Swiss-Prot record:
GO cellular component: cytosol
HAMAP family, per database record: RecA
Compartment(s) where it occurs, according to its Swiss-Prot or TrEMBL record: Cytoplasm
Keyword Ribonucleoprotein: no
Source lineage: Bacteria, Bacillati, Cyanobacteriota, Cyanophyceae, Synechococcales
Family, per entry: Belongs to the RecA family.
Protein's UniProt name: Protein RecA
Biological processes per GO annotation: DNA recombination; DNA repair; SOS response
Gene from which this protein is expressed: recA
SMART domains reported in the protein's UniProt record: AAA
PROSITE patterns the record matches: RECA_1 (PS00321), RECA_2 (PS50162), RECA_3 (PS50163)
Matches recorded under SUPFAM superfamilies: P-loop containing nucleoside triphosphate hydrolases, RecA protein, C-terminal domain
Amino acid sequence: MPVEVKSSQSSGGDVRPGERDQALNLVLGQIERNFGKGSIMRLGDASRMRVETISTGALTLDLALGGGYPKGRVVEVYGPESSGKTTLTLHAIAEVQRRGGVAAFVDAEHALDPVYAASLGVDIENLLVSQPDTGEMALEIVDQLVRSAAVDIVVVDSVAALTPRAEIEGEMGDLAVGSQARLMSQAMRKITGNIGKSGCTVIFLNQLRLKIGVTYGNPETTTGGNALKFYASVRLDIRRIQTLKRGTEEYGIRAKVKVAKNKVAPPFRIAEFDILFGRGISTLGCLLDLAEETGVVTRKGAWYSYEGDNIGQGRDNTIGWLEQNPEAKDTIETLVRQKLTEGSEVTSNSMRPLAAAARSAATKSAAKGSEVQADVKTKGAA
């Protein structure tokens, strides 16, 4: 006769819901005792998991990023030369200092201009600046600043200038294949966890290089290997698309920023703004672009009007009017923000109301459908 064997059931199957909750609380308490408070938590109960942001200085870019640079995350800003990378980060430093925060600038390129930084609103007297000799020294300084939890933002300018010690101590022309990529990979593994715990935002500026032998696709790539691409929560691709001129005099550039990666908001949005030589990002220019798109300010020909009154002929004159009328500027900004909170999306340099976009799409769809029906009837009659 066959012998009946009783299968032993796992203890988890016989545990009641109340006992499961008790066991979970016990193990959570044990983990916190072993590894410290905050080592494990429920996502809904963790206030520090709610991502706060730092303004970029450009309202259009803030909207494209979902509020600004996320705190406690790694950000990479890359682009060609003279596209506005350093200017963008100096504005972020100024915003942090304006809120009473502490900022640090790791100048690996040894190219920081204090006079220009001060003109953008940076408090250079209280700005922490380091000009390291090697890439290892620079990244170790970043790690110690982050672990102190006393610094709100650290900017590294740039990844391409983080030269490994072995390359500096070697002879000119010696091959050091992959040394910078290995350095960045090790550094990102080490500092990313500390960045999240301290709430410090670390912005890496990066340069572009061309891949050799690429026939199809984009030949551009960033320096320092692939580690930074993976660890960065936000990656911004900034380009100069236009040179601003008054007659023959050049006074600024028009910059276009594409959000190539975003882990805290929808990616692939695009923002445009003006960067004025010696003054930085034109905040009033950003406001005027958004006010026009949201309908707060209207334009007929070259004239801009607000509440039915003409306020300026041409974009530059209208921006000048906003500078001379701060109360009206504040009112327009409030109205623009109210429009944006009602529901809108970033389209290139400004915003487009979702409802209007939906109506436009529906109208086009209906028109296309009627054309198809008319075509079918015509063919049937023939």
